[in-house]
Amino acid sequence: AHTAGDMMIWLPEERVLVAGDVLVQDIIPNFRDANVRLWIDTLAEVKAMPAKVIIPGHGPLMNVEDVARMHVRMARLYAGIQAGYKAGLTDSEIRKQLDLSEWRPLHRFAEQMGGNINRAYLEIEAESF
């Protein structure tokens, strides 16, 4: 997911999940060391958990609805990059065509988004071999 050594702590009696940087709220997630496809799969699993409170690595407390929004946003981005790759576009060309409106309000958009698109593109490219 976010990194090769991700760890989350689940407190079942309290229904609290300490998620670390696997989950972030109001900030662009950092794809630099990520397996983005696995991260999206992990988000699908987390949103199915019966958590009352989720403590993200960055931002305010989350709930499963927040996780669902992050999951949809990341899955939509990955699918858009994948479609662009399959159409023969470069990551720079894809970046110009993607609808990033849901990402723009998030903290660190300018610093992170270009690198995230490039990282996901390279992952998709590697999987195609």
Regions flagged by a language model, labelled:
Residues A48-P50, L61-F129:
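Accessory terminal helices/loops
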